[in-house]
Amino acid sequence: MKSYIAKAQEVERKWYVVDAAGKPLGRVASQVASILRGKNKPTFTPNVDCGDFVIVINAEEVALTGKKLDQKMLRKHSFYPGGLKETPYREVLAKKPEFAFEEAVRRMLPKGVLGRQMLKKLKVYRGAEHDHAAQKPEVLELKY
């Protein structure tokens, strides 16, 4: 008996809605990354993008536990000497909560072409409204 290997044309994609309000950022991001990769499907193939689309709403209400709001930093470097810029997550979540969530998920996905394809299937919204009602997304209850 041969192992089943999914082909990109055969993959059926579903749409899911995840409400991130009051839930820890890392826990929500890890489950979203798993769905984007397709690890929740029995036909998971590591070298094929077989994941589903995920819509994350209420990104501005995501929680960070402990002192992470002040101690955790978003770091950017300009590649010039002394070009490191650090921003505390309190400021990042206040200005661009979508970016903070996308960064958390992006770092959990594979690095390379496949990871960039998977990240395109992630739609993050600041509030409770989104533009994807036509796709009839299912509400996804997270494990924790």
Curated annotation (Swiss-Prot):
This protein's name: Large ribosomal subunit protein uL13
Keywords: Ribonucleoprotein, Ribosomal protein
Source superkingdom: Bacteria
Family affiliation: Belongs to the universal ribosomal protein uL13 family.
Protein role: This protein is one of the early assembly proteins of the 50S ribosomal subunit, although it is not seen to bind rRNA by itself. It is important during the early stages of 50S assembly.
PANTHER family (UniProt xref): LARGE RIBOSOMAL SUBUNIT PROTEIN UL13M (PTHR11545:SF2), RIBOSOMAL PROTEIN L13 (PTHR11545)
Organism: Clostridium botulinum (strain Eklund 17B / Type B)
GO molecular function: mRNA binding; structural constituent of ribosome
CDD domains membership: Ribosomal_L13
Gene: rplM
